[in-house]
């Protein structure tokens, strides 16, 4: 199996050799075959319009990379529009709730958000070094000191505090970028979110070569600026098959500057997750089919997760990656069905 580094290099190389060129007539099939390691039956599955996902080899057990692809008889612009449509995303498999933040985020943007009762129970015994809910150390102290744990309306109070803390964390990121994302100290090895994100994006080693604006934006926000980027924030409550998880995400939609050689990409950068993910980045590119109208949605989901090492962790990892693979297939198929529900006007 190819390593995740080579997978993502070849993945982004597709953007440098669009299928509209003569030398790109075999793309993305050559990429599927030589880089992802798909056999002809698997490639045929994708060409026939079915979604396919595959777990990609990673360098360490706590890193998880999943590749997925599906052919869609629609235009890439329709996908970019869908990726920015919160109402449409809410209907995709796995979503419990999802809401956009205002351009200037405010507390009311988090109306409707509530922690699971199990999470609230686990917060009662949460302490630095051991906490079932993923929180930076300073947030753990604030939770412990700010609440009357015997109050009859405890769930309400916890959720009000959680909303205020989530809003402040987002505002801090909008001002200070990755360094404001904090450090998780509820593990034996403290994890700085900025460092773990850098380690994941490093695997996308061709990204700074072929999409330098997008790469810089992901690493250097808010200092980085680009006319080719549309960005926004949302929160989501999702079920990955284990515990329901609350996440704050920055969505970055990228359109290449050259009309003759367009590049379409969507990056979803996790800023916070209540469970599992220390950091995560989903990168999707749209590659037009050389032989027929339509395009391929090709996604690589990369994350760094706690609790996946050791004997117990290896068992958890097997379950987690299998659920991630099957979930990606379901989501890609749902996206395809939605995009193809309107007639294709031409690419």
Language-model regions, residue ranges each:
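Bacterial N-terminal signal peptides
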Residues: 6-16
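Terminal "cap-and-tail" regions of soluble proteins that handle hydrophobic small molecules
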Residues: 23-72, 76-78, 88-89, 93-347
């Amino acid at each position: 199996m190819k390593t995740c580094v080579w997978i993502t290099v070849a993945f982004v190389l597709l953007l440098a050799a669009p299928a509209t060129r003569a030398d790109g007539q075999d793309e993305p099939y050559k990429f599927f075959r030589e880089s992802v390691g798909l056999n002809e039956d698997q490639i045929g599955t994708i060409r026939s319009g079915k979604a396919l996902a595959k777990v990609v080899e990673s360098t360490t057990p706590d890193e998880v990379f999943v590749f997925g692809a599906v052919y869609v008889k629609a235009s890439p612009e329709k996908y970019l529009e869908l990726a920015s449509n919160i109402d449409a995303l809410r209907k995709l498999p796995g979503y419990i709730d999802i809401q956009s933040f205002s351009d200037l985020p405010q507390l009311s943007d988090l109306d409707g958000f509530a922690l699971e009762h199990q999470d609230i129970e686990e917060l009662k015994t949460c302490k630095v070094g051991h906490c079932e809910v993923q929180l930076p150390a300073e947030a753990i102290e604030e939770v412990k000191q700010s609440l009357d744990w015997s109050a009859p309306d405890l769930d309400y109070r916890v959720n009000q505090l959680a909303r205020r803390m989530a809003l402040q964390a987002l505002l801090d990121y909008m001002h200070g970028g990755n360094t404001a994302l904090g450090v998780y100290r509820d593990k034996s090895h403290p994890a700085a979110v900025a460092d773990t994100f850098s380690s994941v994006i490093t695997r996308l080693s061709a990204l700074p070569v072929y999409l330098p604006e997008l790469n810089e934006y992901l690493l250097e926000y808010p200092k980085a600026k680009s006319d080719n980027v549309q960005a926004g924030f949302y929160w989501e409550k999702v079920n990955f098959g284990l515990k329901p998880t609350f996440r704050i995400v920055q969505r970055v939609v990228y359109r290449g500057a050259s009309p003759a050689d367009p590049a379409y990409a969507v990056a979803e950068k996790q800023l916070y997750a209540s469970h599992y993910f220390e950091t995560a980045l989903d990168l999707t590119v749209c590659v037009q089919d050389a032989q027929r109208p339509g395009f391929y949605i090709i996604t690589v989901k990369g994350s760094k997760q706690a609790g996946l090492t050791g004997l117990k962790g290896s068992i958890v990892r097997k379950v987690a990656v299998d659920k991630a693979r099957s979930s990606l297939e379901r989501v890609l198929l749902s996206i395809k069905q939605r995009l193809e529900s309107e007639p294709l006007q031409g690419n």
